[in-house]
Amino acid sequence: MYPTLVPSTYLESHLWFIELLAWWQGRVNATDLSRHFAISRTQANKYMQRYRALFPDNLDYCKTIKGFVPQPNFSLRCISGDASEYLDWLDKQGSTVCNSSAHSSHQFDHQPITHTSLTLPKRQVSPVIMRALVSAIRTRQRLEIGYVSLSTPDDQGRVIQPHTFVKTGLRWHLRAYCEKSSVFKDFVLSRFRGEPELSGPARHDPAEDLGWNTQITLTLQPDPRLSAAQRQIIEHDYQMQNGELKLPVRAALAQYLLQELQVSTKFLAGSGEAQQLVLVNRDEVKPWLFDS
């Protein structure tokens, strides 16, 4: 169930936090709020009361563990229920998140929730260039700027008309109309060079970007070289339906999605265990793939 509230306001962020801990950690109390948001116990209690007033069937106080626990008919109202939402929150808290209301003498203490994540190398983007790109998008302007690529390593001037920043896993890029190539294309942010200069209103609207505005579906299946038992594992991993995973995506982003899933569209890896997923509608989506 998708949330009916999102943590976009001060109140909603507290309600979201209450529900997040209650659902995923099985308990929440005023001390959790007080420590996480650096507020008084009185304020924290008011937020707990507010949550219970809004969603009276969700939480019940348990004297034994000194906290509110989910009731059997708990209904998600502020969180999505997707484990990645909780894991993303954990990631933002640091390498260890403890049960903040636990004490070493309490019989219901829990072990700290430990986790870690990879630290990816940063790609340098000049603040001057970044501010110019933001300004060009906000004001719908053309931008004169230098750019290098592996095929043209010498700094070449470009006039672009940017419309969207895109994160594709390891890096950020910019979707923009390129006047040199006369097409909408992707530019890696760290490869812009020089002193950018705004040069008048953009002449191409994002609505003209066919690759950006075309929705396609990638159909994936477990590698057929896997055994039936192995295929079932992959199907469960990705919550496949009838042995297939269908992923709707903007056509311009299809290749990036496949790369993140480590799905090769050129050749199969040496074994099914290494490949795991295969794209079964390659001919259908081939016009949008740039490594086919």
Map each language-model feature to its residues:
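Short, basic/aromatic recognition patches that contact phosphate-bearing ligands
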Residues: 1-80, 220, 272-292
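Short, hydrophobic/amphipathic alpha-helical patches that form generic packing surfaces
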Residues: 16-20, 85-89, 252-263
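Conserved short hydrophobic interaction patches
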Residues: 54, 195, 260-264
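A generic structural signal for beta-strand entry/edge sites
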Residues: 65-67, 142, 171, 244
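Bulky hydrophobic/aromatic content
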Residues: 70-144, 260, 267-270
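Core beta-strand-centered patch of the WYL/Sm-like small regulatory domain
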Residues: 110-224, 229
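Polybasic (Lys/Arg-rich)
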Residues: 213-292
